[in-house]
UniProtKB/Swiss-Prot annotation:
Cited InterPro entries: BBP-like, KH_1_KHDC4/BBP-like, KH_dom, KH_dom_type_1_sf, Qua1_dom, Sam68-YY
Protein name: KH domain-containing, RNA-binding, signal transduction-associated protein 3
Species annotation: Mus musculus (Mouse)
Involved in homodimerization as annotated region, ranges: 1-160
PANTHER family from the UniProt entry: KH DOMAIN-CONTAINING, RNA-BINDING, SIGNAL TRANSDUCTION-ASSOCIATED PROTEIN 3, RNA-BINDING PROTEIN RELATED
GO cellular component, one term: nucleoplasm
């Protein structure tokens, strides 16, 4: 009986006139059920010991009758269908939007619906989402429950919810407007903040490096100039802190950092600029200024010293620094004079 049933249905389908749309629909439904084995009695028991994979399907109605003006299909699909793809990946299910209004071209949808083909039979049903799961029984029902809970969020007719806002941002990003996307904007702002914070840090590094020639301030006659070097350390750090005040009159060879861009708009290459300038200004600018271009740091230190107080550093001029080598022989000769008295006979 079953062997003859399918050929009879196919012959009856071919004999029907295309104008009998309802008859063709019923015949196609019967053929589809027979091919899928749905005509057989369904199993009433689930064997959880064997844990065999089972197929679970559920149709979720889309409330287009209650909210006819809301585009539920667009919200479910998202930009380029990415929202529905991510929803399937998260829930580990297969989802399909079927029924009336599931196709964008209404004329083609009506044509396919009247064609009577089995794969387009769903166009006669109401608009719905078909959720299918193929997994062990416990996992299949767990996935189905998760999918029903997640898809419920997409069936709320709200234009300003989090899902809609995320889709608009993604659509802007896909259309080439990366400056309005979330990730580039956050990175661009972070780089602007680091620029404003690290500028004094760079000057501190310069002050710390230029504090090497502190021996210039060693007064005459001090027997232990090394102790003075340690006491002059905090003064050098103070100079580094006051260097931003001296930037109004930049010394020769000084190259000020470029001004940061405005935060209102972000250009096309803001993503690259965010990381490139952040590392250049924070990490390597101080080393380049102090080691690769020592003349810049020396000039900065020299101008600051003379601009702060010339009278205080008159006794520590360049002549004393160049003639500091003669201090040691003069001190030795003085010590030798004291030693000549007990050993004068030799």
């Amino acid at each position: 009986m079953e062997e003859k049933y399918l050929p009879e249905l196919m012959a009856e389908k071919d004999s029907l006139d295309p104008s009998f749309t309802h008859a063709l629909r019923l015949v196609n439904r019967e053929i589809e059920k027979f091919q899928k084995g749905e005509g057989k009695e369904e199993e009433k028991y689930i064997d959880v010991v064997i844990n065999k994979n089972m197929k679970l399907g559920q149709k979720v109605l889309i409330p287009v009758k209650q909210f006819p003006k809301f585009n539920f299909v667009g919200k479910l699909l998202g930009p380029r269908g990415n929202s529905l793809k991510r929803l399937q990946e998260e829930t580990l299910t297969k989802m399909s939007i079927l029924g009336k209004g599931s196709m964008r071209d209404k004329a083609k949808e009506e044509e396919l619906r009247k064609s009577g083909e089995a794969k387009y039979f769903h166009l006669n049903d109401d608009l719905h989402v078909l959720i299918e799961v193929f997994a062990p029984p416990a996992e299949a029902y767990a996935r189905m429950g998760h999918a029903l809970e997640e898809i419920k969020k997409f069936l709320i007719p709200d234009y300003n919810d989090e899902i809609r806002q995320a889709q608009l941002q993604e659509l802007t990003y896909l259309n080439g407007g990366s400056e309005n996307a979330d990730v580039p904007v956050v990175r661009g702002k972070s780089t602007l903040r680091t620029r404003g914070v690290t500028t004094p840090a760079i000057t501190r590094g310069r002050g710390g490096v230029t504090a090497r020639p502190v021996a210039v301030g060693v007064p005459r006659g001090t027997p232990t100039p090394r102790g003075v070097l340690s006491t002059r350390g905090p003064v050098s750090r103070g100079r580094g802190l006051l260097t931003p005040r001296a930037r109004g009159v930049p010394p020769t060879g000084y190259r000020p950092p470029p001004p940061p861009p405005t935060q209102e708009t972000y250009g096309e290459y803001d993503y690259d600029d965010g990381y490139g300038t952040a590392y250049d200004e924070q990490s390597y600018d101080s080393y380049d200024n102090s080691y690769s271009t020592p003349a810049q740091s020396a000039a900065d230190y020299y101008d600051y010293g003379h601009g702060l107080s010339e009278d205080a550093y008159d006794s520590y001029g360049q002549e004393e620094w160049t003639n500091s080598r003669h201090k040691a022989p003069s001190a030795r000769t003085a010590k030798g004079v004291y030693r000549d008295q007990p050993y004068g006979r030799y």
